[in-house]
Amino acid sequence: MMIISSQILLLFGFKLFFETRGEDDIVELLCKIGQTQIPSSDPLPILRGSGSGGREENTPLPPPLPHQNLFIQEDEMSSWPHHPLRQDYLCSELYASTPAPHPQSSVSLAPPPPKPPSSAPYGQIIAPRSAPRIQGTEEARGSTSRKRSRAAEMHNLAERRRREKINERMKTLQQLIPRCNKSTKVSMLEDVIEYVKSLEMQINQFMPHMAMGMNQPPAYIPFPSQAHMAGVGPSYPPPRYPFPNIQTFDPSRVWLQSPQPNPVSNQPQMNPYGQFVGHHQMQQSLPPPLQVILSQYPLCLFLCSNK
């Protein structure tokens, strides 16, 4: 009877301890204590603790009664060595009595599974792929800039050559114009225009006289300033360059040859009209009346060009 009462008190103490500590602590404590024996005829009651459900967690624990002694006396413990504990039976009964944990708690307490390699951070996957694209873009920009710089260099070189050619032509033109010492291109071109106009007036003045013949006096053609004042003819500016002094042929005069022999006459002489470059080509390009005039009197053109 005393053994039964001690076992009841022990179970009641385990129950209180189980309610305060939990199932895991009770199982660990019972496994460590190997001096209690529970008969196989009396099954252990199912103990429910804080892990069995959420309703018992909120209910307060009943206070212990003052007449109940939770500590085991020495006389009660003296009978424990005569009854060896079957530890496998006690542990199996306690493990069987514990309810299975809720699946939600196991899911919540379980560590998160490792992420697959496909769900790696964005930078670790995109960075290697974007590197060749960035490199290709930089190469394309570099090639485009090189092409633009090369095109600019070619354009500058062409402009430099064109300016050099223009300067050379302007120098040549300045040498052809007499008394032209202008430095600017505009003033030099003005002198060229005036010189060409004066040459045109000289040709218009002397060509009719040569076409009619040398035995007739030249027709009187007033200067542009006089013709403009008289109201006859177009208004031309006065020529800046003097007209060539050409002596007309007088048939009343008799030209006598000197009796002294000229030693230079026997030597071969150069044709004075050979200075005209492209003289025959120029005659072929002119109309027939001018070709006849220039073939008979090419000296006028020679004098006008030299002046």
UniProtKB/Swiss-Prot annotation:
Record-linked PROSITE patterns: BHLH (PS50888)
Alphabetical UniProt keywords: DNA-binding, Nucleus, Transcription, Transcription regulation
Highest taxon of source: Eukaryota
Annotated Gene Ontology cellular component terms: nucleus
Main subcellular location: nucleus
bHLH domain sequence ranges: 150-199
UniProt keyword DNA-binding, yes or no: yes
Localisation: Nucleus
Pfam families for the chain: HLH (PF00010)
Composition-biased stretches (Pro residues): 110-119
Region (Disordered): 41-68, 101-155
Gene Ontology molecular function: DNA binding; protein dimerization activity
InterPro entries cross-referenced by the UniProt entry: bHLH_ALC-like_plant, bHLH_dom, HLH_DNA-bd_sf, PIF1-like_bHLH
Keyword match Nucleus: yes
PANTHER family, alphabetized: TRANSCRIPTION FACTOR BHLH119-RELATED, TRANSCRIPTION FACTOR PIF1-RELATED
Subunit structure: Homodimer.
UniProt record similarity statement: Belongs to the bHLH protein family.
Protein name as it appears in the record: Transcription factor bHLH127
Organism (species): Arabidopsis thaliana
Gene from which this protein is expressed: BHLH127
